[in-house]
């Protein structure tokens, strides 16, 4: 079973109990003795300290805490699917729903054929989908629907679509789906080869995990971060509740290595666009600020191929 700890506190000490329950032992010890306060903010005020969000209560640090990314900082969703592959809404429906959430842009990233379990887009499909995206942009302007793809990384590191097709797109996500049990050296070489493709902008769900269903693959993340930094490829924080990949710990390691991240929903329906808070909360656990997240930027910056 899953252990559960129930904390009961009087209203006037509720904030104190929250700080104790959300901080690590080392962090709380550095604050002792904690004053009684009804709110967390009250605890910090009584100590004469700036408020520290729960995600940062791991270890004591000097100075003001960084301003972590908030859901409201996100300007667009860069990983969504439609009925062209395994999604349940059309291009226009996904675009309209993203616009209604206050976004400035959304990238349609349907699968390519090698994904196997679902229908993937061929080169001809990608070009036919472009017509539907153009029509949606006429209706939804100034909101922008981006031409994207979630392109499978083949076992040898090649991508599942030719370069001339990828060059036409606004946003290319590279993903491993099959072969998750590949040995670490082979998996790392496979992903590195894909990251060196000049059209790739982001590596999707890098560790391939399904929480409580499938463990992380054997990808050498330290090496992957080095290559991502060298090539300018961002790493995704996938907001599907089963994935949350990168994890908070991996996000922190990526940021320490100088790698940028993308907060995405991997939405397969209009409802799936609501996964963004899960992605942002995971990024926050890795101490991500808005400046660390590609899609907190305006569209012109996202489209700039500043790898």
Question: Can you describe what each PLM-predicted range is?
Answer:
Residues 1-82, 88-102, 106-108, 113-143, ...:
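Charged catalytic cores and adjacent phosphate/nucleic-acid-binding surfaces used
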Residues 148-151, 278:
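Active-site catalytic microenvironments in core metabolic enzymes, especially phosphate/sugar-handling
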């Amino acid at each position: 079973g899953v252990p559960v700890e129930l904390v009961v506190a009087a209203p006037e000490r509720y904030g104190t109990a929250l700080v104790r329950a959300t901080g690590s032992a080392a962090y709380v010890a550095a604050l002792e003795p904690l004053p009684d306060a009804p709110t967390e903010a009250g605890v910090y005020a009584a100590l004469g300290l700036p408020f520290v969000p729960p995600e940062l209560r791991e270890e004591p640090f000097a100075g003001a805490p960084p301003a972590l990314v908030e859901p409201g900082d996100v300007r667009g969703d860069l990983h969504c699917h439609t009925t062209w592959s395994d999604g349940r809404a059309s291009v226009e429906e996904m675009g309209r729903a993203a616009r209604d959430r206050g976004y400035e842009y959304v990238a349609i990233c349907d699968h390519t054929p090698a994904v196997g379990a679902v229908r993937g887009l061929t080169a001809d499909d990608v070009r036919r989908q472009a017509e539907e995206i153009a029509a949606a942009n006429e209706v939804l302007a100034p909101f922008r629907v981006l031409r994207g793809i979630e392109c499978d990384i083949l076992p040898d590191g090649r991508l599942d679509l030719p370069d001339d097709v990828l060059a036409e797109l606004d946003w290319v996500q590279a993903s491993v789906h099959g072969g998750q049990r590949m040995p670490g050296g082979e998996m790392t070489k496979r992903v590195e080869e894909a990251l060196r493709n000049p059209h790739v902008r982001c590596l999707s769900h890098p560790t391939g995990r399904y929480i409580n269903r499938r463990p992380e693959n054997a990808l050498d993340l330290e090496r992957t971060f080095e290559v991502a930094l060298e090539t300018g490829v961002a790493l995704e924080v996938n907001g599907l509740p089963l994935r949350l990949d990168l994890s908070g710990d991996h996000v922190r390691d990526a940021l320490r290595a100088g790698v940028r991240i993308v907060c995405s929903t991997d939405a397969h329906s209009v409802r799936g666009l609501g996964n963004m808070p899960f992605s942002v909360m995971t990024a926050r656990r890795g101490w991500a600020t808005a400046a660390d997240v590609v899609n907190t930027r305006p569209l012109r910056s996202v489209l700039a191929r500043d790898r």
